[in-house]
Amino acid sequence: MTTGSKAKRRLTILGSTGSIGQNTLDVIAQLGGRDAFEIAAITGHDNIDLLASQAKACGAALAVTANEDRYQALKDALAGTGIAAAAGRNALIEAASIPSDWVMAAIVGTAGLAPTLEAARRGADIALANKECLVSAGDLFVRAVAEGGGRLIPVDSEHSAIFQALEDDQQHAVERIILTASGGPFRTWSREQMANVTPATARAHPNWSMGFKISIGSASMFNKALEMIEAKHLFNVRPEQIEVVVHPQSVIHSMVGYTDGSVLAQLGCPDMRTAIGYALTYPSRTKLDVERLDFTKLARLDFEAPDEVRFPALRLARTAMERGGLQGAIMNAAEEIAFHAFVDGRIGFLEMADIAEAVMDQMIATGTAETMDAVFAADEEARRRAGVLVAQREKAA
């Protein structure tokens, strides 16, 4: 860990090859790179060329691929550099356990749960971009952060906005959390049109540059559904205090409403590097090379209520929060299976929500999220059931 004002901060990036990870390395480079930071470890999955290139560029001590079959390729790519290579699930957890001041948790999906939880237990400040930590194991994760003594700083643009708009010592005065949503590429489409959506069409986000999974999650509004559950755990609010408003321009990233009628909002151009930079330098702010918001060029800012008939994921999030227990983990796992089935052309776009809801209803009596074993068991069973439903629909088509 760092000591002294001039010591380099020690960082770990879990998920460096994804969209968030790449933007994180860009921010680190802007803020001084090797002169200001020591990179303890970076991790990726199948993109070995990019992972090795990143490790060399940032001077990481360790590079880890989650795919054990790619270990030799990574080792060969790093030969002669002095950078250690490792592979597999246990290697991810070991990378997360390396003492660091700050950990970017950007591994997508439930694969990020165990390593992020380990980093939290070790006392690092966690810049959280992985949704599943809070959606599937919110109480466990928040408790691990508290026990570890680190800080939890959200990186999602919406949660970062809320984090910034929350006034110190005014939690008691928070009346509502207002998450904004662009509405995605199908905001004005009918259900009939959405039934014929292809993965390529769903991938096109109108405002943000993001990865494939997140882009399709934005199109279905499942991302927003997960963010609702995250907000409940991050900001210790009741489900009924969480609102979603569609804001097509994505200029207002989210808002906090207070009991005196005031609403505080965080605005900016849609660029993930702003939220990443804030998380990296919190509680300070620093100069970043990102586009500045020009109010004179904003012709209008529009807002509308979300249509939960066309976008039922929002309703499912409320159901999961009301039921509690493992419903968040179940919803997330079932949606992941449905997502892959949609991408593979096995089911339609609208069927993703149908499958998630069906599995949630089937597993309504499943226990509580008291342990990671319980979370993983529910996740595994939800995936199995979702797979069965996908196969049934595919056969009936």
Swiss-Prot record:
Stretches of the chain forming a coiled coil according to its record: none
Enzymatic reactions: 2-C-methyl-D-erythritol 4-phosphate + NADP(+) = 1-deoxy-D-xylulose 5-phosphate + NADPH + H(+)
Keywords of the record: Isoprene biosynthesis, Manganese, Metal-binding, NADP, Oxidoreductase
Pfam families, alphabetized: DXP_redisom_C, DXP_reductoisom, DXPR_C
Keyword Metal-binding: yes
Catalytic activity, EC: 1.1.1.267
GO molecular function: 1-deoxy-D-xylulose-5-phosphate reductoisomerase activity; manganese ion binding; NADPH binding
Binding sites annotated in the UniProt record for Mn(2+): D156, E158, E227
UniProt: 1-deoxy-D-xylulose 5-phosphate binding residues: K131, S157, E158, S182, H205, S218, N223, K224, E227
Protein family according to the UniProt entry: Belongs to the DXR family.
Function: Catalyzes the NADPH-dependent rearrangement and reduction of 1-deoxy-D-xylulose-5-phosphate (DXP) to 2-C-methyl-D-erythritol 4-phosphate (MEP).
Protein name, per record: 1-deoxy-D-xylulose 5-phosphate reductoisomerase
Organism name: Rhizobium rhizogenes (strain K84 / ATCC BAA-868)
Gene name as annotated: dxr
